[in-house]
Amino acid sequence: MRIVFAGTPDFAVPSLRSVTQRADVVAVYTQPDRPAGRGRELMPSPVKLEAVARGLPVYQPQTLRSPEMLEQLRVLRPDLIVVVAYGVILPEAVLAIPDDGCWNVHASLLPRWRGAAPIQRAIEAGDTETGVCLMQMEAGLDTGPVLMSLKTPINAHETSGQLHDRLAEMGAQLLSDGLGLLRAGLRPVPQPQLAAGVTYAHKLGKVEARLDWEQPAERLACRVRAFQPWPVAEVVLSGERVRIHEALALDLDHSQPPGKVLAASKEGIDVACVQGALRLCRLQREGGKAITAADYLNARRDLQVRA
């Protein structure tokens, strides 16, 4: 089976490894090298690094819509194109090239959380369950029929980074299972997505990281987890803007205004929210590294409040 693999970030690497064990990967498509780091040097994508290490041909077009790119894909004669977090929309002309179409591994239980940030939005919304889907691609954004899926609970204190790593491995396993069926002549049966329950996971932005104490503590705790490791939640704490790497929601009755420090100890800094309180456990001052609440309080003697 001849497969073209298209993917870019870390999430796609386990799937690429999985495909190489099941089929002949004739080409890997990934986004062009991007400037990164303080020196703004061009850096290859994680998928490119993996593909090069495996001796696979790598292509990095700016677009797949040009006649030259379409002809290049046709010459490769793929039976199937596998897409995992590629970051480039495949035009219908590309979708029509492989005999078996194009498959996509998506990090949610479709139709919930179509779009660019399904992992973060699931945690932000307080979802207790998510999963991965293997989808037959069509022209719409994550609208294609679902071939297979795997479910998993979202753990109470799980961050987006932690869930990302679990779902990446689950997606690779799901893809391997699907390819195994296809090779055996047992094509997975496409199940159309239901119109009910569609939600969209729009791309994360840095401005979202700024938390507002005028929200319930439970929602803020979910956002702290959702925005870890990027863009990392930010709050104003007694006049200082700090980043929050870990926090807990407290079901606490109080009559204090939102943003008021209620208690501060080595366990954490409890801040009043419009409903409940948020305990800040790991913080980061501007220009510093993430530290415990105890270490932060050593530098902020003005916050030495006791419960």
Swiss-Prot record:
Keywords: Protein biosynthesis, Transferase
Alphabetized SUPFAM superfamilies for the sequence: FMT C-terminal domain-like (SSF50486), Formyltransferase (SSF53328)
Disulfide partners: none
A single cellular component GO annotation: cytosol
Binding site for (6S)-5,6,7,8-tetrahydrofolate: 108-111
Enzyme Commission (EC) number: 2.1.2.9
Top-level taxon in the UniProt lineage: Bacteria
Catalytic activity as recorded in UniProt: L-methionyl-tRNA(fMet) + (6R)-10-formyltetrahydrofolate = N-formyl-L-methionyl-tRNA(fMet) + (6S)-5,6,7,8-tetrahydrofolate + H(+)
NCBIfam families, sorted: fmt (TIGR00460)
Native organism taxonomy: Bacteria, Pseudomonadati, Pseudomonadota, Gammaproteobacteria, Lysobacterales
Species annotation: Xylella fastidiosa (strain M12)
Pfam families referenced in this protein's UniProt entry, alphabetically: Formyl_trans_C (PF02911), Formyl_trans_N (PF00551)
Family: Belongs to the Fmt family.
Protein name: Methionyl-tRNA formyltransferase
UniProt cross-references to PANTHER family, sorted A to Z: METHIONYL-TRNA FORMYLTRANSFERASE, METHIONYL-TRNA FORMYLTRANSFERASE, MITOCHONDRIAL
GO molecular function: methionyl-tRNA formyltransferase activity
Gene3D superfamilies xrefs: Formyl transferase, C-terminal domain (3.10.25.10), Formyl transferase, N-terminal domain (3.40.50.170)
Function: Attaches a formyl group to the free amino group of methionyl-tRNA(fMet). The formyl group appears to play a dual role in the initiator identity of N-formylmethionyl-tRNA by promoting its recognition by IF2 and preventing the misappropriation of this tRNA by the elongation apparatus.
